[in-house]
Amino acid sequence: MAPTQIFVSPEFYGVYILQSEPSPRSFYIGSTPDPIRRLRQHNGDLKQGAFRTRRTSRRPWKMIAITHNFPSRVAALQFEHALQHPKTSRHMAGGGGSVTATAETAKSAPVAGKSDATSPAKNRRNAAPVARSGRTHLRNVARLLESPYFSRMGLKVTIFDPSLFDMDLLPAQLQSFAAFSGARTAACSDYFSVAKKAALTTAHCCLCSDAIDYVPEMLPESIKDVLLVLPLIAVCPSCAVICHLRCLAASWYQSSEINAALIPSDVSCSQCGAQTSWRLVADMATKLRQYALSS
């Protein structure tokens, strides 16, 4: 197995909302690992834009908000699809479909007394009214963040339009698009340096006391040969103690309530007691393994 086949959490992947400046009621939803480059593509500065943003009369487009910190590209694409199809998405919290203006819904509703024998395409249009305001889209984002599936991912929202910034509507960060960078913070870089040093100098798991090169026996030999270089290990950002990621998960599950979720939100260090985001620890584990395989 080549190192490129090993999963690594992306540095950045976001789902963005664009608004047309000449036509403020026109929006576009997409996903990207590079929002700055993607916006230039939508506005025609670079090639490979999108079919729906190609019309010169709708340009320029501006990015009004982006949801990020997804654990994988697949998770971002699922969020993008749900935001594009809020009326039919199973991830919409509350089960009531999307939040759309009453007037918009009324326009698309069938007229009383008319036959229901319409074409499938028309039925699809009637079932999914298009949101025509930035606040409506952000309400749908808020509902997705409350869903059981997305709520445990530790997603973040950055809003670039001050007129849409409302903490009561959606907990988010307000920032200018020019100042926004998809790169992780310097704190994450420092964490990687600490984790890398700990992984290279520590030989045993602090929870099970086994060697850090432990790999479950049920894995095929071909996979063992690769993973033995460095398995998924967790490093505490506070005290740099290390353990197997699976041992940390098992420890959390044993200390949790009977009806606890399968994936933790936060975990506690067995040595210093510091609370750490599970996403942060798990993402770092994939990066450490990639580092070992590429060294």
Swiss-Prot record:
A zinc finger (SLX1-type) spans 205-272. Residues 11-93 form the GIY-YIG domain. Gene3D superfamilies: GIY-YIG endonuclease (3.40.1440.10), Zinc/RING finger domain, C3HC4 (zinc finger) (3.30.40.10). Keywords: DNA damage, DNA recombination, DNA repair, Endonuclease, Hydrolase, Metal-binding, Nuclease, Nucleus, Zinc, Zinc-finger. GO terms for biological process: DNA-templated DNA replication; double-strand break repair via homologous recombination. It is an enzyme of class 3 (hydrolase). It comes from the Eukaryota. Its EC number is 3.1.-.-. Residues 85-133 are annotated as: Disordered. One of its GO terms (molecular function) is 5'-flap endonuclease activity. Its main location: nucleus. Its cofactor is a divalent metal cation. PANTHER family: STRUCTURE-SPECIFIC ENDONUCLEASE SUBUNIT SLX1 (PTHR20208:SF10). Forms a heterodimer with SLX4. Catalytic subunit of the SLX1-SLX4 structure-specific endonuclease that resolves DNA secondary structures generated during DNA repair and recombination. Has endonuclease activity towards branched DNA substrates, introducing single-strand cuts in duplex DNA close to junctions with ss-DNA. This is Structure-specific endonuclease subunit SLX1. It comes from Meyerozyma guilliermondii (strain ATCC 6260 / CBS 566 / DSM 6381 / JCM 1539 / NBRC 10279 / NRRL Y-324). The gene is SLX1.
